[in-house]
Structure formats: C-alpha cells, structure tokens
Amino acid sequence: MIFRTLAYVFLLGSVSWADIPPAPSPGVSAPPELCLFRACMEKSGGSVMISPFSLYEVLRYMLPGAAGETEKQMAAVLPGDGKIRRNWTFLSGDFSRSQRCYSANRIFADRSVELKDAYKKAVGPDAVAQAPFRENMAEAVRQVNAWAATNTGNRIRNLLNPQRMSDRTVLVLVNAMYLRAFWDSKFEGRDTALRTFVREDGAACQVPMMKQQVFTEGRSWPRQGGMYYEKDGVRGASLFFTGGKGAPVFMAVLPPEGRKMKQFIDGMTEEEWNGILSSLSARDAAEETRKPGGKPLEQYSRYHLRLPRFSQSSPTLSLKKALEALGMEDAFTGRADFSRMGSCAPEPLKIHGGYQKCAVRVREEGLDASASTAGEMDPFAGAPPRGRGPEIEFNRPFLWLIYSPEDRAVLFMGTYEGPECGKKEGKP
C-alpha cells in the first residue's frame, strides 16, 4: 500500500536525533515535558532549547484525524486529554492583552488532499489553507516559512528546508508561538557587568551578568518580583512578568554543586519537578502596602539575583526519533491510521517527519521567545529569611523554563551552558 505523507513542523532546539535515547533510570518517573527534554539532551553538544507547548499543539491538531492504535499512541504522548483547547489562560487572560503573546496553528494542504468534514470542524474553519506541494514544492515551503516568520515576530525563519522534504509530502501542520513580556521587577542596565561564567568543561568565560534585589512578597510596595527555591543542593529563582491574570513565570534552576546538567535532569523525579514548578510560581496572595506604621521594608523576604543576559537560537530540529522513543511509533509507518483526517485518494496518510525551531532573548527589561513546530505526513523548602536574604548567581550551567502555572503548561525550556570561550555574549 502506498502512503502519502503529512508534514508537521515543530520549533525546537539544536538536537540531532540519530539514536533512540535510553530509558530513564528504573523507578524515576517523569512528566511528558521532562521525558521530551531528556531525549533532546541525548545528542546535544551544548545548550538545548525546546518548546513543549508548540510541539503538543501540533499533535493536538493531528489527534482528531487519528484512529486505532495510532490515536492511542499519540494520546499517550500528550499531557492531559489531548483535545484541542482554545482557552489557554496565558493566551486569553489579562496578560495576553497587555503583552505580546500569541499562538497560531495552520494546516497547509495540497489541493489533492480530501479532508473530512468532521476533521475540518474539529480544527476550525480558519485552520486550513492550500499550498502547492505537488506542483511546486519550493513555493509551498516558502508559504509555510513566511507564515511561521510572520507569526513569530520574524524571529523564526526558514523553518522548512525543501531539500529535507519528502517529494510525497501533501500536507503540513504548523504551530507558531511568540512571547514578548516585561519583568514585574526589572533589572537596571547600569548594574549589568561582566562576570565569570564557568562551563561544564571547566572553561571560564566573561558574560554580561544582570543584577537585582527581588522581593518574594508584597503586591504594591514593595512588589513581589519572584520566588526563591533551595532544597537538597538544588537552588532556583523565578521572575514574574507584568500583565496580571494568566502571566507565565520565568524560572532558572542550578543543579547541586559538582553535578553535571544531564545527570541532574536524568535523575529528577516527578515529585521534584512538580515541587520546583509550584514553589517558584507561587505568587503572594496577601495585600501588602508600605505605609506609616506598616511593616518595615527590611522585614520583607527577598533574595539577591545575578542572571546572565543571554540569547539562544536553535537550528531546525528533527523530532521523529524523539516521538518514536516516547512510544509514538505507528504514525511514521505503514501502520499509520489517519482515516479520520482524510486521504490523498486513493492513498492513506502517514507522518514523514516533524521539525521545530526556537529562539529566546533574556534582557534587563524582559524577554522575548518564539517557536514554531511543523509536522510532515508521508515541594518548597521554606521561605527565604527576613532581612537581606540569600544570594544566587547563575555563573555555571543552569536549566531555565517559561511556565504557565494556571495552565500547567511548559511553554519553553532549555539549558544555558554559557558562550564559547572567546565568543562574547555582548557588552555589559
């Protein structure tokens, strides 16, 4: 039987999927996002960056077209019920209206593809567009890339490469995501200075290190700017974004001294992961106002943060082996069942490949992050002490992520390993 291929596009970090990654250590369970990230780290030669949310959005738009064992395997990879959701809090609340934050999905289909009415109803009337994959592959790829660039603030370009596409591709599913937001508690540019960052290989590099005092309580003055975490040698800090309801949280986590990043990620349990997320995303519910007779400023909890100013971007990452390693195997083979989606008469559809590309910039005033994904078918250890509070400097490799606590969704995550020594990150 001949199969036509669908193309799904994902925007991830710079990883090559030549091998299926080993399973986690026995007894170490992990949520889907962490399993995915472990797989990405296997072939990485440096910093890693992915957008779990962008990948999952593409799979959610594929799932209504899947049936049988293919549907079961895809649903098992996805967090939650796997259904298409249009009411994400970070995209529909106060935050999305005050900051630049959006996510879009599009299905590019050749005119030879017959999509079923039930599938088109499930994905929405505006989700499908035509592209001439059979007649002019280069033009179809140009249309996909242009759409991805437009919907990521022009940060993601050339998502698809015509030379990497199957000549039997007739359909591509794409997600594009863009976030530009400001810290609730901003860094002062005059406080940024070059400081030493030590890579895992022992090389010492100079990076522009931002600095600020972050209050962990208070809603007016002082204003809560983030949270601090310390347990079993693991230290972390978070920074909140301005924007109100639905605002995600930026988090950075240092492994225990002497532990390699991969060893730290591979050994993390689901309980530890959830503890870090819940502790670092806890916003202060108390109405605190400094006024005569009120609590003195020095009695507020706080921590002192030094964080590199950095940028990361990834080349296009192939996700096929990663998804196969997570149990989604049939969709890429002749066993694929996308009968609920449609066909390229008289041939059924299967997935040929999946690709993702990401970019992020962390600055004194805030950050911007973008991702695009395409699919191709052929507990807290306690509050910091009162007074001055602890100091935390991210001067060695760390894990970072952007997390939506109300949606329980990891939007972006990555590791920062530092620049190549001799290659400057930028002036302070």
Indicate where each model-derived feature is located.
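Conserved structured core elements
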Residues: 30, 49-53, 68, 167, ...
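Sec-dependent N-terminal signal peptides
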Residues: 5-14
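Non-catalytic, conformational "gating/processing" segments within enzyme and secreted inhibitor domains
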Residues: 84-263, 283-385
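Short, positively charged
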Residues: 19, 23-36, 367-389, 424-428
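Detector for small/aliphatic-rich hydrophobic stretches
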Residues: 1-2, 17-136, 140, 146
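Extended hydrophobic
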Residues: 173, 230-231, 235-253, 383-426
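Soluble, non-membrane globular domain cores that form compact, hydrophobic packing
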Residues: 271-275, 428
